Amino acid sequence: EYPQIAEPTADSVTLSAAALADGLRQVVPAASNDDNRLILTGVQLAAEGDGLRLVATDSYRLAVRDLGGQSVLEEGQSVLVPSRALTEVIRSLGDAEEVTLVLGAQDATFRIGGVRVTTRLISGDFPNYRGLIPETQANTLTVDRHALIEAVRRVKLMARESTPIRLEMSHNSLELVAVTQDVGHASERMDVTFEGEGLTIAFNPDYLLD
């Protein structure tokens, strides 16, 4: 028999569907797909100031997005929602203007028009990620997102699965470099805005595209 879904009894909150969809699209990809690490398969929804903070990590990537003014939880409260359920929420949001969220003790329900998505919350403590986020940034890179995506895709063609892409940053310049032994070398230079000392860092290209 199909399981019966109880009507949510907690108070409901109405949010901007566009703001929630935008935040979820940025955060959900960082959640883990490994069911052996159940806590990391969830997205934390937490009270942050007068708004809502979305956080996900698979221990390699960390994504944090604040939705200002989207008050859902009381100060200090947080819940952990399965990322798979939130993927369905993203699909259901479509062009909707509003979404109603009900957070119970064990369940979360999203109402979008005539669609209702209900999921069990994940029990457990989400990792303390705050120490990983610096309070100040010594270096700041500003780059056109679409141009960066296309450049990473081109350079990635030369990178094997385990080969990272180097990002070499200097004044108003970014060079993407991939070197694979016995295969070859690929690089591409972009005009950007960079503030700070020269810096070279390396990323898994798939994570960078996410």
Please describe what each predicted stretch is.
Residues 1-210:
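Structural preference for solvent-exposed beta-strand-turn elements
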